């Protein structure tokens, strides 16, 4: 390659293989990383004279890349002014360079002996005057990106190898920061810090150099082994939880069904009394319903003995002795069914049943034969089924006082209620009417039932309970202790109570029961609590 350089005087080339100064620096290149021939070829300075030198004084300015840096080529030049050899120095006095800016950048970038500069595409692009701070890697990436762009514009799928090689070429060692090229962080949307060099591989690591060798689950970061590593170990699978919930629901539904069946059976066995309103008279129906007393467990066996003592049950089959499922709370209403006088409780003679009550129209609740007489009070109770009336046990009950008696209101204060089921104290006044048994056996009907067991009891109460014959009509009871004021009875002595009762019975004139035969209207009668 010829270079036009003006040198004053005659020049003598010390190299025997070179006949001309501008023939090129092809044989003695001693500096690595700088290819002077390529740089001078790219400059293509024109020759202005036939002898290879330019006659223009302006062309005497030497080429300089940096000030004071020689080309390390030994050349002997006879200077008529000095007449000595000197090193050819391409330094410019004016500091102005005639070479293209690319040559200076080529010098600064430090290419090594050709390199990518010798490629046709790169060299062609450089000769067309491409300017900009691009390195070799940037040019390679630019060509690859241009190729990808051609694929995109041609509507052809981009090969994965082209994309992977492009991603791997971005900062493989992390040596160059993104902003060193002047393009900022523009790298096709990829970031060097978050980029995965192996996209399809599990990303589970030990925090240092080890990485899982398994392939990751599609659309996940980790493999099947490590995908659930971050979850709590005690967490059960969803399928197991669903199965457990279904089993629990099935068990709960079965229990609910069995409970409903038991309740329906209990409801079928109990009375079908429909209570209406919240009046005090409706507490009769609540007391007539099943009531449970847990303090005395001997009443169950006692009721069974009452039913099975004669072979034929005193109480009909429609009467449920005690319900095991339902336990309604005991009402504290003083007008309940079962407010009785203690004298009639303790004197079984004169057909005095222990169901003597003090409420005003109580006979209308139990007397189906005299409903016309008490039509005013009957509207508080729902109509009873006719098929149940025939099965109910009829009792001969005597109300010892007239309905208009002034002492009747005092009797309402008695707390003795029919709260215990089939209490023995009631059965000593409980007898079967002559409709069922022979009148000759009527004396045996009033034999009192002993407490819980058949053992005889001592004391005044045992004397009354163990009596086998009818006591005198107005016999006094020695059990004055039961006639205390806490019971709210008519007086503090049983004799006085008997006298008042006898007087009231005489006032009726005919001496008959003012209510007549009444019918027990409950399927589960309750007994007084002592």
Curated annotation (Swiss-Prot):
Motif (Bipartite nuclear localization signal): 201-211, 229-236
Known tissue expression: Strongly expressed in actively growing and developing tissues, such as roots, upper stems, and shoot tips containing the shoot apical meristem (SAM) and flower buds. Also expressed in mature flowers, but weakly expressed in mature stems and leaves.
Main location: nucleus
One cellular component (GO) term of this entry: nucleus
Top-level taxonomic group: Eukaryota
Alphabetical UniProt keywords: Activator, Nucleus, Transcription, Transcription regulation
Biased composition annotated in UniProt, kind: Polar residues: 11-27, 519-530
Membership in a protein family: Belongs to the GRF family.
Note: Overexpression mutant display larger leaves and cotyledons, as well as a delayed bolting of the inflorescence stem when compared to wild-type plants.
Subunit relationships: Interacts with GIF1 and GIF2.
Domain notes: The QLQ domain and WRC domain may be involved in protein-protein interaction and DNA-binding, respectively.
Listed name of the protein: Growth-regulating factor 1
Gene that encodes it: GRF1
